[in-house]
């Protein structure tokens, strides 16, 4: 027995395995690993990418208040408390003008903390290693087996070649395209999928935020968005045609289109600067039900994908990791697997609430461009939703609860 993070943890061989095998070092896997170590549950994490890649991978940075409470309450929030910024206002721009919703003062009175996901991941990696955790970067997993038995295993491929890891449970936190969800036999889970028919050109630019709040611009040429990331980096989105080559947009074209859709001539100029990263994001959603099969439990994007329209993905990952950590801890220390059996039933209502609001946001921000009767009808519906959000305090309180909550 050795001491780790104030708890006694059984230590297994360096390659043989652990009680909980975690695949993937994103927010779900890292929060899960840290919580298990703190609870005295032996675990290890394998991650296909390098540490450098994981720690610089830019992702959404809006953390809900409940997520912050989980991180801070478990000793994982020092970085976000020191460097995160409270954000409680969002702005909508339309042809009728601009209106701000101070959602941090509406509903439950909760705001977001802006803290880039790559910074959070770096914090979680450092804390996991500080607690003595076993984290193996550059180690893809090609197969997971034994899931319907007592000793599940996975085949890992490290720098010295392939080897098998065995454990009592496997946590699949390796994303939608990861190995774990592909190992579930056909017919054992039901996938609910929706392709929203909307694509965004996602841009990370090397300029300070031009606006004090998240700003959603609805324009006849398509949606545009402004989201702060750090004091020197800003995220922008431009709605584009599905299948667009991100490289086909020159920097001049990007900024000209942002100026047009954000109505810079009317509301003030944007801060132009270099485009550091660009990618086309197709807005899609899927949910697996159940989120488990045998000894395999999925969390984060491995269990379901949510569109970025409402910034819920990382928050759902953290909440699922907390639920799973509690269930593993009870199973290991008390021999009671009831919470594990209920894992999907516990998580799915929260996930579907987030999916519903994300779907509503997509309808709020997008509408067809055509001049046919149906397109005109859908645009009028969208405009009515925006006007209702602008004028109805009941709608504003409901929006705040869903936008900032989980």
What are the residue ranges of the model-derived segments?
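C-terminal helical "tail/cap" subdomain of flavin- and related membrane-associated enzymes
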Residues: 3-14, 311, 326-406
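Extreme N-terminal leader/targeting segments of oxidoreductases
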Residues: 1-20, 35-39
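Conserved SAM/SAH-binding loop
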Residues: 138-142
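Glycine-rich FAD pyrophosphate-binding loop
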Residues: 37-59
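Conserved FAD-binding catalytic core of PHBH/FMO-like flavoproteins
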Residues: 126, 133, 143, 149-279
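Active-site-adjacent segment of FAD-dependent monooxygenases/related oxidoreductases
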Residues: 56-59, 64-131, 355-358
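Conserved mid-domain beta->alpha element of the FAD-binding
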Residues: 23-38, 124, 279-360
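Generic enzyme active-site microenvironment
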Residues: 45-46, 172, 217, 299
């Amino acid at each position: 027995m050795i001491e780790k993070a104030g708890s006694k943890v059984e230590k297994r061989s360096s390659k043989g395995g652990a009680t909980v095998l975690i695949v993937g070092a994103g927010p779900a896997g890292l929060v899960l690993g840290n919580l298990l170590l703190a609870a005295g549950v032996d675990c290890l994490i394998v991650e296909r990418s390098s540490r450098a890649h994981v720690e610089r991978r830019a992702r959404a940075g809006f953390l809900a208040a409940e997520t912050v409470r989980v991180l801070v309450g478990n000793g994982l929030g020092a970085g976000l408390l020191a460097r995160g910024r409270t954000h409680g206002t969002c702005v909508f721009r339309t042809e009728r003008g601009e209106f701000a919703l101070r959602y941090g003062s509406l509903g439950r009175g909760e705001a977001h903390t802006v803290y880039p996901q790559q910074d959070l991941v770096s914090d979680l990696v450092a804390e996991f290693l500080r607690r003595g955790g076993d984290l193996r970067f550059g180690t893809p997993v090609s197969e997971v087996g034994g899931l319907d038995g007592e000793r599940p295993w996975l085949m890992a491929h490290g720098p010295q070649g392939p080897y098998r890891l065995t454990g009592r449970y496997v946590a699949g936190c390796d994303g939608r395209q990861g190995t774990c969800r592909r190992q579930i036999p056909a017919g054992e889970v039901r996938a609910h999928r929706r392709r929203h028919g909307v694509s965004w050109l996602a841009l990370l630019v090397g300029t300070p935020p031009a606006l004090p709040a998240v700003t959603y611009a609805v324009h006849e040429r398509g949606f545009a968005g402004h989201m702060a990331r750090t004091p020197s980096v800003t995220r922008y989105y431009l709605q584009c045609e599905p299948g667009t080559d991100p490289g086909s947009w020159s920097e001049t074209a990007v900024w000209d289109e942002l100026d047009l859709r954000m109505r810079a001539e009317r509301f003030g100029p944007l801060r132009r600067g270099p485009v550091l990263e660009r990618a086309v994001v197709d807005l899609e959603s899927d949910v697996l039900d159940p989120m488990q099969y045998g000894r395999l439990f999925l969390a984060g994007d491995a269990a379901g994908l949510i569109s970025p329209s409402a910034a819920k993905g990382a928050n759902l990952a953290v909440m699922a990791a907390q639920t799973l950590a509690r269930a593993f801890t009870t199973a290991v220390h008390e021999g009671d697997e009831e919470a594990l059996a209920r894992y999907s039933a516990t998580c799915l209502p929260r996930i579907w609430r987030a999916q519903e609001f994300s779907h509503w946001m997509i309808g709020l921000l997008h509408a067809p461009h055509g001049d046919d009767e149906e397109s005109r009808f859908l645009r009028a519906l969208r405009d009515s939703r925006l006007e209702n959000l602008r004028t109805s305090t009941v709608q504003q309180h409901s929006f705040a609860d869903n936008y900032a909550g989980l």
